[in-house]
Amino acid sequence: GDVYKRQYLFFATGFYLRHKQVIQADHDAPIMRIAMDVAYPCLVFHSIMKYMVLSGNETLSSVSFSLQAIAAGALELLLGIAAAWLVAKMLRMRIGTGLRTFTLTAGVQNYAFFVIPIIQMLFTAGNDPTLGVLFVHNVGCELVVWSIGVIIIAGGPGNLNMGVFFRGPLLAVIVGLALAWSGLGTYVAQPPLMKAFEMIGNCATPLCLILFGCSMRDLCHNMKWEPKPIICGLLTRLGLAPALLLLMAYFLPVDDYIKRVIIIQAAIPSAVIPVILAKRFGGYPDLGTQILLTTTVASFLTLPCWLALGSTLVVPLY
């Protein structure tokens, strides 16, 4: 319940601030740049340093285990995106009518913000490494979102300035992994620097959720609800994608800690980042907003079912 309350509180804050014109429409772009190009990279870099360099956990810092976790995270998102793209094609969507936004919003789960409190509730032992495994796994998710995801939402690499790949979260992933695997991370991850990265990184999620709340306020008067894509988005994100991810967890020859994370990821609703990217790169944020809202609400019912199924068929969670 807490994860839903927190998310909706931020949505409501953004909605109210837009309603009162505290955050005006022309403020969105600079706030988005701060969130995407400053705060989010700090969050990613801090997570890599904390769990792969400073944790003292030999498993998390080993190259072979971290590559397994990163590959699993990337494969998850590629499966989800491919499933959503196929559904969008069956709906006869095209670029300009929601193909890109549907593919990314229905294909990408809320792989960090939504998952952290679930892991904290399920695995309470002080030395349990599952949360650390999540953050290493999420490096793979970040790689896919900020490369393939950005290419999809922009309508192809030809529509992008290549500089977009050499800043922000993707750069944080590349630099973070290079430092972690080379052994140089211990020299960089000093307490004052780490604290600064942590504090700036902690702004990323609230800023994104508040911006989404602003978008909800903009769209609530003139939003045209589209039942067919919404229902298909629900079935894709909370039906087809979870089934594919549980099959992946079952057959993938990876450590049980990674399988745990995959099971939880399978049950999660759509992420906010694709909606923000749709706004930034000329997608169809109305559709993304509708899929995000409906999958988040519906996951109240579906999330426990998928967790129970994964716990029974793949590896125990409880």
Specify the residue positions occupied by each region the protein language model found.
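Alpha-helical transmembrane segments of multi-pass small-molecule/ion transporters
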Residues: 1-318
